[in-house]
């Protein structure tokens, strides 16, 4: 009876794998044999906003990122960050113990939608750049998919010794690309 739904299960597994692969590429892809991720496209350019204190996330940094975005792009701007960064912002309190960003409970930050992107930096590492928070008009980030995909069934997988392992495999091939159209439509925080 296990064979009845094998194609449905195989489809589910392959679609999930493609989604995970695409999410990473659309965020940090290099643009060489893969899509250009929005973090990669913005890193090192004028869209980067440095944190007030190196290797630290402070409430003032959030305001600085939002203020740095030109008015032209503010109307459709949204936030995106790793869940660790979102949770760090949720924990920020005033000296009286009130939350600095209580609207994060409703998926908003400073009046704009907040989106989770697990492929962004979530831990601040002192030895590298940390692009932990992005804000901008994502209508200026384009994703292009070529219609169709190819699934190749591999009847015998080979081990390191070049002999069959008794396992079967599948290779899913599809084409996709992405890039930022207008760098000025985004700001990204480097903590």
Language-model segments: residues:
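Structured, hydrophobic secondary-structure cores that serve as assembly/anchoring elements
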Residues: 1-191
